[in-house]
């Protein structure tokens, strides 16, 4: 008879769901598919049960057969490598009833030397539903504040307290200016103003304009020679008109 499968108990699932295990004595790049089970089956691992079949094999020091072959001939809690794609390894915790019948209990993934418990379907769906329902609950609570009822009009909306977009932009602008002011201290402001006043005193704007005018007068632009088109062709004097006699 197969054991009844259902959502795991929250009292057993919640503590280990947010836990992790890491053995500092094992470098992360040293872990591969051949020794990942040895890394997982550690007494300090919170996900590892000491009464499992893997622990019995380690205590008996069986070396003439592979671990998978030994586990197929044993019954009880077992840990097997389910998937391998370095640096990711997935370990399955299962209950073996006979040589051909196993019931998965939980999955764990090992990545870069850290062991974490994979969420089951019940926990995953519950988390997604809570993540979707919480914004809806906040939205309905916000909408309820603007709902009004009148015997003549019935239900209607009233958004008098809703701030306008222009006001929001002004508040945002003031906040940005306030942040810019907070970046400098009073000493820095006073020091900057003193340096600017000193520069204006040493190099006033009027003297700079006068010097610029003097330079332009000292270096007058050379007169351009008139072009041939402006001079035109030479004109000859016309002969005096002959006197007419009657």
From Swiss-Prot:
Pfam families: Med6 (PF04934). InterPro entries: Mediator_Med6 (IPR007018), Mediator_Med6_met/pln (IPR016820), Mediator_Med6_sf (IPR038566). GO terms for cellular component: core mediator complex; mediator complex. Keywords: Activator, Nucleus, Transcription, Transcription regulation. Disulfide bonds: none annotated. Residues 166-184, 208-224 have a biased composition (Basic and acidic residues). One of its GO terms (molecular function) is transcription coactivator activity. The keyword Transcription applies. It comes from the Eukaryota. It is found in: Nucleus. Residues 165-186, 207-246 are annotated as: Disordered. The keyword Phosphoprotein does not apply. Its main location: nucleus. GO terms for biological process: regulation of transcription by RNA polymerase II. Belongs to the Mediator complex subunit 6 family. Component of the Mediator complex, a coactivator involved in the regulated transcription of nearly all RNA polymerase II-dependent genes. Mediator functions as a bridge to convey information from gene-specific regulatory proteins to the basal RNA polymerase II transcription machinery. Mediator is recruited to promoters by direct interactions with regulatory proteins and serves as a scaffold for the assembly of a functional preinitiation complex with RNA polymerase II and the general transcription factors. Component of the Mediator complex. Interacts with let-19/mdt-13. Interacts with RNA polymerase II. Interacts with mdt-28. This is Mediator of RNA polymerase II transcription subunit 6. The lineage of its organism: Eukaryota, Metazoa, Ecdysozoa, Nematoda, Chromadorea.
């Amino acid at each position: 008879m197969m054991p009844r499968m259902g959502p795991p108990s929250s009292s057993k699932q919640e503590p280990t769901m947010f836990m992790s295990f890491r053995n500092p004595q094992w470098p992360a790049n040293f872990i591969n598919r051949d020794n990942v089970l040895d890394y997982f089956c550690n007494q300090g691992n919170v996900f590892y049960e000491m009464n499992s079949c893997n622990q019995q094999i380690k205590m008996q020091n069986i070396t003439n057969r592979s671990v998978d072959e030994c586990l197929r001939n044993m019954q009880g809690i077992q840990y097997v490598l389910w998937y391998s794609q370095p640096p990711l390894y997935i370990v399955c915790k299962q209950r073996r009833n006979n040589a051909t019948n196993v019931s998965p209990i939980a999955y764990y993934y090992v990545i870069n030397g850290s062991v974490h418990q994979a969420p089951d379907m019940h926990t995953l769906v519950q988390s997604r539903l809570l993540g979707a329902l919480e914004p809806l609950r906040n939205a309905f609570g916000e909408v309820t504040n603007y709902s009004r009822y009148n015997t003549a009009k019935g239900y209607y909306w009233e958004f008098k307290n809703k701030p306008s977009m222009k006001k929001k932009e002004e508040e945002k602008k003031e906040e940005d200016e306030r942040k810019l002011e907070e970046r400098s201290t009073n000493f820095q402001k006073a020091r900057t103003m003193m340096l600017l006043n000193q520069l204006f005193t040493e190099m006033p704007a009027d003297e700079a304009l006068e010097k610029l005018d003097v330079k332009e007068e000292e270096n007058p632009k050379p007169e351009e020679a008139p072009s041939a088109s402006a001079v035109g062709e030479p004109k000859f004097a016309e002969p005096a008109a002959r006197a007419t006699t009657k």
